[in-house]
Amino acid sequence: IEQVNAMSKRVLIPIADGSEDLEAVTLIDVLRRAEFDVVVASAEERRMLTCARGTRITADTMLLDVLAQDFDLIVLPGGMPGAKTLGELEPLAERVRQQARAGLDYAAICAAPAVALHRYGVLKGRQVTCYPGMSDNLTGTHFLDQPVVVDGNCITSQGPATALEFALTLVERLAGRGKRREVADAMLVPATN
């Protein structure tokens, strides 16, 4: 049985003003519970950010300062206008394209698959999901109306209610089913199988 050193896994979570509160906090929390090295990076010109519902988050660092670093996973929360801000940030777009080309995991939830990953050009021909009202934006993809969709190294999810399943899926991708179960059990998530 392969033993994965969770702390050796690095995750980048870019956030902006207007990122979706529950998605951002769920991703940060669950991935840190899995003992990953999670870097929360501001796409704005300051570290203190205000999410879509008013939750304030202080980023660990500035996004442009860490884009040259290696990450096992880059994951974008949704929410508007946060996802749009991430979608329009060309240095992030190029970094996610590099991640995709290298066969490393990249992920997004809610509006972010439609307004960021699709804009970056990393979803063509992929099976994906997003916030249902935005699926028309996903031209050139195979939209699936499912909570979480994994297609190779691309992982997408629908929205706030699917954020926990999405985060646990990302834990499993990076550290295996046992780590997913350990994190889920500690959070009192009922076992599904």
Predicted segments, located by residue:
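Short, Lys/Arg-enriched N-terminal segments with co-localized hydrophobic residues
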Residues: 1-6
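Active-site-adjacent pocket-lining segments in enzyme domains
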Residues: 8-15, 19, 30-42, 59-193
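Short N-terminal binding/cap micro-motifs at the start of the first secondary-structure element
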Residues: 19-24, 48
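Short glycine/proline-centered loop/turn elements that form peptide/ligand docking sites
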Residues: 25, 42-45
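A cross-family phosphate/adenosyl-ligand binding-site feature
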Residues: 48-60
